[in-house]
Regions:
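Core catalytic DNA strand-manipulation module of type IA topoisomerases
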Residues: 1-264
Length: 264
């Protein structure tokens, strides 16, 4: 069901599915949708903060590299080992990432302090709005080796940002390094904020439901969030729920006029 309210078009759905034995029920519902008033029964304004994903451990790194680049796990670890052992740079042979075999989400205080300083400079006047000034904590698995660190860049200063570092790396090394770099940096950026409001409309006893999914503040997602989300949601059977849906605001009792009634 397509509507327009306060200048915003949107669509609501009914869970009624066509079955030959329920044809009469379907016809009655369609008749109600065409002839009965469409009245807002419930509107709940919900905003939800979305945290960044934790820094990479080995298994998550392999999974993300496969989803984004179709790298096989062994190839991902070969590239990661090369980045760990070091590449030739103008200031000598330099390890680009920490040890790539780990099951810990821990980041050292020194690394976090460096990230905060670099991000504060990167965001400039927006730093207070974007940069998390205290260390974000991620819970390890009970058997994780907490003394180890997650997979992260060894340094975060300008010469180590992917756009600069790529001149010292192969194409595939750059892909993996960039993914690790932004994933790590995003952990010290504030949460994204989404409108996830719920709308229920009554039409002659039939219920139509809509759920918003609109980003209000990008937060950590500004740092390559699109690719980070793709890597994490690729195997989510409910990935469709992340498509943007914008709903206007409503008052209970508002009467809506449908623009189009369709059946699938």
């Amino acid at each position: 069901m397509d509507y327009s309210h306060r200048g915003q078009q949107f669509r609501l759905t009914n869970n009624l599915k066509y079955k030959p034995e329920a044809a009469a029920e379907m016809e009655a519902a369609l008749h109600a949708f065409r002839t009965s008033p469409h009245v807002v029964e419930n509107y709940k304004r919900i905003t939800n903060e979305v945290r960044p994903y934790p820094p990479f451990i080995t298994a998550r790194l392999q999974r993300a590299a496969f989803y984004l680049f179709r790298f096989e796990p062994d190839y991902t670890m070969k590239l990661a080992q090369e980045l760990y052992e070091g590449v030739d740079t103008p200031w000598g042979r330099t390890g680009m990432i920490t040890y790539p075999r780990t099951d810990s989400y821990h980041l050292s205080d020194h690394a976090v302090d460096e990230m905060i300083a670099i991000l504060t400079d990167h965001y400039g006047e927006e730093a207070d709005e974007y940069v998390l000034m205290t260390k974000r904590q991620f819970e390890n698995k009970t058997n994780a080796q907490a003394a180890h660190e997650a997979i992260r860049p060894t340094h975060f200063s300008e010469e180590y940002w992917p756009g600069v570092a790529q001149q010292y790396l192969t194409e595939d090394q750059t892909r993996l390094y960039e993914m690790i770099f932004y994933r790590t940096m995003s952990t010290q950026v504030r949460n994204a904020l989404y409108d996830m409001s719920i709308l229920e409309v009554d039409v002659g006893g039939n219920k139509l439901i809509g759920r918003a999914y609109e980003r209000l503040f990008d937060g950590w997602e500004r740092l390559d969030g699109h690719r980070i989300n793709i890597a994490e949601r690729n195997d989510d059977p409910n990935a469709f729920k992340y498509r943007e849906v914008v709903l206007p605001e409503f008052d209970v009792g508002d009467e809506l006029r449908p623009l189009e009634i369709t059946t699938v």
